Amino acid sequence: MTQQDFRTKVGNTVFGVRATALILQNRKLLVTKDKGKYYTIGGAIQVNESTEDAVVREVKEELGVKAQAGQLAFVVENRFEQDGVSYHNIEFHYLVDLLEDAPLTMQEDEKRQLCEWIDIAKLEGINLVPAFLKIALPDWDGQLRHIHLEE
């Protein structure tokens, strides 16, 4: 049975709920690069799926490895425009532990993308999406933060 993503479109605005993995090792963040931008691993949660289960599923789908959801670090209300479409996402950013070695490529639908480890002190120098992570992640104090973004 195909699962339905927790996403809907009204007019020119897409509303969705996402879960993303903040995979950190030795103060480096695992990201993937596409079209000059860097992204964390993650995606839409499915209807009736917890955000913790969603982030573990997304890591398995995209990286092909088992993972365990850790602490929820950020809840983000993210509004932005991309390719002429408005988006309003509620995002759950979890610290995630990989239970297997991280690959250096990921699978996004039919496309393979390279992954790389970026030192969190150097995030400011890359085009990271969402951009708030450049400052919020290196300065994170272990407490859940609620962030409002309009990019």
Per-region residue spans from a language model:
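Acidic, metal-coordinating catalytic segment for phosphate/diphosphate chemistry
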Residues: 1-20
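Acidic/histidine-enriched, glycine/proline-rich intrinsically disordered or flexible terminal extensions
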Residues: 5, 139-151
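A generic structural micro-feature
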Residues: 11-15, 84-90, 107-112
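Short connector loops at helix/strand junctions that flank enzyme active sites
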Residues: 16, 24, 40, 67, ...
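Conserved Nudix-box catalytic region and its N-terminal flanking loop in Nudix hydrolases
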Residues: 25-61
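A short coil-to-beta-strand element that immediately follows conserved catalytic motifs
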Residues: 66-75
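Active-site-adjacent beta-strand/loop module that shapes the phosphate/pyrophosphate-binding cleft
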Residues: 80-104
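NUDIX/MutT-family hydrolases
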Residues: 106-139
